[in-house]
């Protein structure tokens, strides 16, 4: 089976969020299942900078190609490289100086035109290279028009008509909603502008188009796949998603066990595994030392997040004065809304012996937090999958979460009688429930037997991409069978 995977960001070439981690890791594990994968992404300015920095070999494989159907004079070139850590996963880079020359990945002169240009260019690239794919796997709204093109404009194309499509929704909150005139720029038929097409409250919705026209849709956790069919989480697309419920699946993201391994991780202070778990305490002491916190055996909470409402910062704000009364330490890493940055700054200034506030992005410090902290906080309002809790489990750092989306699928409440469970959580999105979950974690931290059991349960979970890749193979087979009928 041959797959074309399409994404705006791919680790290590360009990374903004979790999407890059997914598309950077999944092909590696699909390759081990004997699936042939090619990746298509924009040749962002960031990719060019990283290529120069890390010395990646990137070759130009075509001269300029017309985007003939679009209302633009712009053309594109195709470059090629390899995904590190794979035998033959090719990465095809769509180059255009006008659309992909911004300093940031999700920036440019016109985000709608940019997404249309990229989506159309990927299809033209497949035609130019004459590759026969079984599946085109697209990710999020930026690439969601590809299934629309394939099922309308290119439905009779001999090379493209047999391709099945899979759309992965990583976060339904981002949909690509724009003015209707972009339909003309895209060269898509006018009849799509209706309630059963991509019309959306007087505008057009790229993600809605992908949901309607893809053969199979999936989200990044089973719970989130159910949640988005409800009004509370559906972002006004719950009806469209319910209409496709028989083709909607949830597959948990995995984590790259080679990249995130406390036994071999060169970013942490001291390597360890379950058999040498006492060395985790050395990581804690060295983290305290680096951050200027007193070297004390008290519960240390870690949090690595964008500081925004979605991540539960609004309910955290209401309890931090109470939390400050506990004999604990708290390490924050992240940036975001000014009101939350200011709140944490003030806490750090008021309680320097308890709070280490790091308002930045630092991949090395992140690993040290996963390894050195005792507990990891993720009180999210909603969380399609979440990777932070998986990294923390892998490093034996016990998650405290709100049971939503992927957090509900990966974290199970600890039961001291059965000794089952790997963390603590709460369901109602309010400050009192969060505070109680934190208090339960502190209580069991003081019971050495229970805490060691929690660490063991956490570190023996299978959160690898191997498991998830097998689920994606089944998904591809389902999509393929729909086209072959």
Swiss-Prot record:
> Which region is the signal sequence?
none
Gene Ontology BP annotations: glycogen biosynthetic process
The record's listing under InterPro entries reads: Glyco_trans_1, GS/SS, Starch_synth_cat_dom
Functional pathway: Glycan biosynthesis; glycogen biosynthesis
According to its UniProt record, the EC number is: 2.4.1.21
- Supply the alphabetized keyword list: Glycogen biosynthesis, Glycosyltransferase, Transferase
> Which Pfam families does the UniProt record give?
Glyco_transf_5, Glycos_transf_1
Family, according to the entry, reads as follows: Belongs to the glycosyltransferase 1 family. Bacterial/plant glycogen synthase subfamily.
Q: What is this protein called?
A: Glycogen synthase
Species this protein is from:
Fervidobacterium nodosum (strain ATCC 35602 / DSM 5306 / Rt17-B1)
Q: Which gene encodes it?
A: glgA
